[in-house]
A protein has these predicted regions:
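Generic structural signal for beta-strand residues in well-ordered domains
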Residues: 5, 49, 99, 123, ...
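Acidic, glycine-rich calcium-binding repeat modules characteristic of RTX/beta-roll
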Residues: 1, 23-27, 184-283
């Protein structure tokens, strides 16, 4: 049975503006009706900012031979046509649908949802939850911290709302990463993550699980225990986060990676990059060369992070953030 849960009315009408006059004239009642009666069979595919026709066919190679853009005699007008008829309800097997969504990341970053996702659970994939609820709740589908980017860059919001851009991430990867004035944050999960910064401006790398509270503010949802993350710097100015301020999820500023866990920092540039720590000064920490690396430890010897190739770095206090954290570089 066809499942149209993916359909986004606003995005469809923005993508195919010639449909709107037919609605205004009363010929059809909605973009959804147009798509079901005409657009789907015609091979229209822009029904959601979180579905990409090319990406779906590239990953689902068993589907491509049955799509009419590849095989004129195929039973499906498009990869989307297959997804609506079968793929959506096949769950995680068909969850690679867009560069704007990663099933592995969504499940790792929203670990509280795991019991609700599976063959016999309310949602057959994380993608189903994301499409029906997650995106509306401010959850995001990749390590790019989408809600904060849109909040800090209101000039691009109209382009996202209109459908000219699918997401803030699309803007950043196509334009923002080349603009020194744009900042971006990449976040991980409570599992082991590899994060790579992108861009010539300010990039923040946070290996732990981060979300937003009901007011749209950042909150930290894990603190690095039993997490072993790799944070890879960008060409721009990076901040590698090993300590966080107080938020709705933690009442006091908190160091990350206490106990079993640590961040491995790569591509650290002493001229441009910073490391964020909890507290007000370096007096609570030891910076100890270990082989070719520099180990960042608490006074008790708990390793929070290691800078690869940083044994000879002379890191010093740079500035206080005024929120219970400070920067060294």
């Amino acid at each position: 049975m066809a499942n149209y849960a993916i359909f986004d009315e606003q995005y469809y009408l923005a993508s195919y503006p010639w449909v709107k006059p037919a609605i205004d004239a009363g010929v059809i009642r909605s973009g959804r009706e147009h798509f079901e009666k005409f657009g789907q069979a015609a091979g229209l595919t822009k029904v959601s900012r979180y579905f990409d026709e090319n990406a779906y066919l590239a990953v689902n190679t068993d589907v491509a031979p049955f799509v009419r853009t590849v095989n004129p005699n195929g039973p499906f007008a498009s990869g989307l046509d297959h997804f609506i008829q079968f793929g959506y309800d096949e769950g995680q097997r068909r969850s690679a649908v867009s560069p704007e969504y990663s099933e592995d990341f969504y499940l790792a970053n929203n670990s509280e949802l795991r019991s609700f996702i599976g063959p016999n659970a309310p949602f057959k994939s994380g993608y189903q939850h994301f499409i029906q609820f997650g995106a509306k709740e401010g959850r995001f589908g990749t390590s790019f911290f989408e809600p904060e980017y849109l909040k800090e860059n209101p000039d691009i919001v109209p382009f996202v709302n209109s459908g000219a851009l699918r997401t803030g991430r699309e803007h950043y990867l196509n334009f923002g990463k080349n603009e020194p004035s744009r900042s971006a944050t990449f976040v991980g999960s409570r599992s082991n993550d590899i994060l790579t910064g992108v861009g010539v401006g300010n990039t923040e790398l946070i290996g732990v699980e981060v979300g937003i509270d009901p007011r749209g503010n950042r909150q930290y949802e894990s603190f690095g225990t039993n997490e072993f993350d790799v944070l890879i710097g960008s060409p721009g100015a990076d901040t590698f986060v090993l300590g966080v301020p107080a938020t709705a999820g933690n009442v006091t500023p908190t160091p990350l990676y206490l106990g079993n866990g640590q961040a491995t920092i790569r591509n650290f540039d002493i001229e441009n990059d910073f490391i964020q720590l909890q507290g007000t000064s370096l007096s609570s920490y030891n910076l100890a060369p270990v082989g070719n690396n520099l180990s960042i430890q608490t006074r008790a010897g708990d390793v929070l992070g290691v800078i690869e190739g940083g044994a000879n770095l002379g890191l010093i206090f740079q500035e206080s953030n005024g929120n219970g954290t400070f920067l060294i570089g």
